[in-house]
Every structure is written in C-alpha cells, then in structure tokens.
Amino acid sequence: MTNIVFMGTPAFAAPILEGIIENGYNVLAVVTQPDRPVGRKRVLHASPVKEVALKYGIKVFQPVKLSGSDEMQEIIDLQPDLIVTAAYGQFLPTKLIESVKIAAINVHGSLLPKYRGGAPVQYSIMNGDDKTGVTIIYMVKKMDAGDMLAQAELKIESTDDTGTIFEKMSILGRDVLLETLPKIISGNVEAVKQDENKVVFSPNIKPEEEILHLNLEAKEIDWKTRALRPAPGAYFKNFKGKRTKLWSIKPLEEKTEFAPGYVVNVDKHELKVSAYNGTVYSIIELQPAGKQKMDITSYLNGVGQGLKIGQRIIEDEE
C-alpha cells in the first residue's frame, strides 16, 4: 500500500483528498493551515481539508510556519512514499520535498507554464482567457516550476467566476491525479519540462487590484468582477459618492459617446453605464458601502433613486 502525506487547505483541495482516501491509498497525515477566525464573532473555523481528515480519522498537522517546525520533522519521520499538495498555502522546504521515497507532487490550478503562483484562476478570468485547467507537477524548490506529469483543460464559460471554476477544477484535479498516481508510483510516467519562455506569473491578488478604474472596457470590468467573485469583490472607489462593489454586470453590444462613468440609460429595472472606449454595460448586482448585496431593481428603488441619463455616477478618485 502506498503511504501518502496530503497537504492542502481550501475547498478546491477537499475532493482531491477524499478521492485519494476512497481509492485505497493510505493517508498517513494531513497538513493544512491553522483554523481561521470567521465573522464578527471571530469564531475559529477548520479548513475544508481538515474537515475531510477528521471525517476519516486522519492525523492533522497545522503549523503556523512549516519550515523549521517540529511538525515538519514529524512528517519526515513518517517516511511517506508520496507527498501530494493542492493549494496548501505555504512553501515546502527542500528538506521535506527530498525526504519522500518516491516524489512530492502538486495539483496546480492552471495550464502550466502559464500562471505560476497563488492566484491562477483569478488571473485566467481577469485576462479574459477562454480556458484554464490543472497540471500535475513534481515539486521543486522553485515555485510551480517542476516537470509536468499530466495536464487537462477546462473551458471558462462567460458566466463562470472563480468560485465556479474552483468547483469544477477540484473534480478535474481529483480525476487527473487518480489517473496519474499509479504511473508515478510504478515509474512509468513521462515528465515534461516546462518551457521557461512561456512562463506567466499569477501572484496573490493585492488589495489595490480589487479596484475598478475608468480605463477598463465593459468586458474588462466583467472579467474583473467575475475573477474576484465570490471574494473579495471588485469595487469602484467613488460610485455616486460611495465605495461600491459590482458583483455582476453584463457587457452590452451597444456603443456610446459618453465618457466612462456616465448613465447611458436608466429605468425601474435597468442601469446602463458607460465604460472606456465607448463600451457599455448593464449592472445586475452591486453593493454600496455599508449595505447588503442587492439586485439593480432594489438599488434603483432605494439608494439609486433619481438617476438620470447623462449623469456622471463614477469617478476614479474618492
């Protein structure tokens, strides 16, 4: 029986862990991020991966910092055949990677070498890509740079956001991993080097990247709102005087002479706004600061009452 240590944290990784367990591999331990405080009462919540581990009675390690920790030495002492990682959230020290009997492998959420880093799904949507996927790689010291062992594509639909892509990708990642594991264990896997000339990075989203600007076309505003949904959300700093998140919009075919940020058309159930380069979009769902999410009808009947065609409602500065 192959002994595995699994390392992962979010919902994306949970079906992958469960698939490994259900397919007869012996999971010696699970390593995940520490429980996080959630909500106004700051109640500690276990990661989705920890919940799976507890369900199956598997030992859990949650080091604040893995490198140099007592937990890392305990993991090494388990002498696993494989380490499998999926969105764990910390770098793996070389000492740990090199301690395994067969290999340390990673399930990465992109078509490598495109989008190395912590936010591959967000960047694929934000850049308007029509596909993404998963890649199984050997783990090396350099981030997401190991040889590729398997890869599978996933279509990005016009309605997809980061949440829906992660849901689909977790199942795809599970299936591709389970198909590839026997080849890795037997030594019959073909390892393909990544083309360093085609590397694109996708670092974690910074707070300033959540801001929507008036130099974006309607389709780019759509890409960004979907990339940052369900969290943290994309926002204009000054939308009718308030910081306002746009949760859902629809880019339209029509064009306008208005500069970006003006009301192109408004009635009881629709608000069309001008964007860069004469493009236009319709707002479907939004959230002014201090308010709950609301559909556009609720907004126009409340906070947004009295808007008129030709009125400027968005500015780049607060």
From Swiss-Prot:
Q: Which family does it belong to?
A: Belongs to the Fmt family.
Q: What is its EC number?
A: 2.1.2.9
* Superkingdom classification of source: Bacteria
Tagged with keyword Membrane: no
For this protein, the record's HAMAP family field holds: Formyl_trans
From the UniProt record, list the reaction(s) this protein catalyses. L-methionyl-tRNA(fMet) + (6R)-10-formyltetrahydrofolate = N-formyl-L-methionyl-tRNA(fMet) + (6S)-5,6,7,8-tetrahydrofolate + H(+)
Instruction: List GO terms (cellular component aspect).
Output: cytosol
Where along this sequence does the record place binding of (6S)-5,6,7,8-tetrahydrofolate? Answer: 110-113
Checking CDD domains in the record gives: FMT_core_Met-tRNA-FMT_N, Met_tRNA_FMT_C
Q: What does this protein do?
A: Attaches a formyl group to the free amino group of methionyl-tRNA(fMet). The formyl group appears to play a dual role in the initiator identity of N-formylmethionyl-tRNA by promoting its recognition by IF2 and preventing the misappropriation of this tRNA by the elongation apparatus.
Q: Name one GO molecular function term.
A: methionyl-tRNA formyltransferase activity
What InterPro entries does the record tag this protein with? Fmt (IPR005794), Formyl_trans_C (IPR005793), Formyl_trans_C_sf (IPR037022), Formyl_transf_N (IPR002376), Formyl_transf_N_sf (IPR036477), Formyl_transferase-like_C_sf (IPR011034), GART_AS (IPR001555), Met-tRNA-FMT_C (IPR044135)
Which keywords does this Swiss-Prot/TrEMBL entry list? Answer: Protein biosynthesis, Transferase
| Protein name (Swiss-Prot/TrEMBL) | Methionyl-tRNA formyltransferase
Q: Which cysteines are joined by disulfide bonds?
A: none
Note the NCBIfam families from the entry. Answer: fmt
What is its EC class? transferase
